[in-house]
């Protein structure tokens, strides 16, 4: 038997860090939403009691470093499943980009194995399993648009944002999320208006949503990688309505209300960056049945 799952990317419309916890994690408040850029996860049941991961992308690990592998092992061991699975990952989301590609692959694996092995687990249970794998996996189980708190595992769903285009540009650099969080100084930083972003989304106001964009990690990554600032500036220059770095970076996204501007911005950025995407903000939850 074979199961197919989409694993959509996410962007952070608002990302705040409120404190560092004793366990080394940080308390966050984030507004995340899914976009129309997705990996494809193909799950095939194996008679052998093992987990295999493969991908055409050479940057995708095929062992326990892969979050989809971890997801399969976790659900298999937790529910004493004696069958195996082959996980084929067709990558569309850029790797190590701040778009939760690995987390979304893990979440899609949890959803898919729940169906493949007829486990009948609730979305809440899958999200709890996801939290054991990574901070973004719980959100990615559901998708849609949500306020994430705690270390990112506490999810409260909110309305779908106003429809718009999202231009993504990823420079050819790698950013360590752990390094960015270590370098973050909570004293004296400007915190984004998370509640204001929720209100803008509830009101379906594109202009207010643009004005409330914020990410406390952005200044840290920009100090480490000036290339990110350059892409932000170019995206603004070519006409994006609002621009922000997603997650810990290095991907920058621009919100664009009118389709007539999209091609110009996309073409302009292609001169500065190899990985450029023009997609829609979807913000709708994944099918979980």
Curated annotation (Swiss-Prot):
Record flagged with keyword Kinase:
yes
Q: Which GO terms describe its molecular function?
A: 4-(cytidine 5'-diphospho)-2-C-methyl-D-erythritol kinase activity; ATP binding
User: Reaction catalysed by this chain?
Assistant: 4-CDP-2-C-methyl-D-erythritol + ATP = 4-CDP-2-C-methyl-D-erythritol 2-phosphate + ADP + H(+)
Q: Which residues bind ATP?
A: 94-104
What pathway is it annotated to?
Answer: Isoprenoid biosynthesis; isopentenyl diphosphate biosynthesis via DXP pathway; isopentenyl diphosphate from 1-deoxy-D-xylulose 5-phosphate: step 3/6
Query: What Pfam families is this protein classified in?
Result: GHMP_kinases_C, GHMP_kinases_N
Cite the SUPFAM superfamilies for this sequence.
GHMP Kinase, C-terminal domain, Ribosomal protein S5 domain 2-like
Q: Which domain of life is it from?
A: Bacteria
Task: State the active site.
Answer: 10, 136
Alphabetical list of Gene3D superfamilies matching this protein: 3.30.230.10, GHMP kinase, C-terminal domain
Give the top-level enzyme category. Answer: transferase
Task: Please give the biological process terms from Gene Ontology that the record holds.
Answer: isopentenyl diphosphate biosynthetic process, methylerythritol 4-phosphate pathway; terpenoid biosynthetic process
What Enzyme Commission number(s) appear in the record?
2.7.1.148
Keywords (alphabetical) are: ATP-binding, Isoprene biosynthesis, Kinase, Nucleotide-binding, Transferase
Q: What does this protein do?
A: Catalyzes the phosphorylation of the position 2 hydroxy group of 4-diphosphocytidyl-2C-methyl-D-erythritol.
Q: Which family does it belong to?
A: Belongs to the GHMP kinase family. IspE subfamily.
NCBIfam families in UniProt: ispE, PRK14608.1
Q: What's the name of the protein?
A: 4-diphosphocytidyl-2-C-methyl-D-erythritol kinase
Name the gene for this chain. Answer: ispE
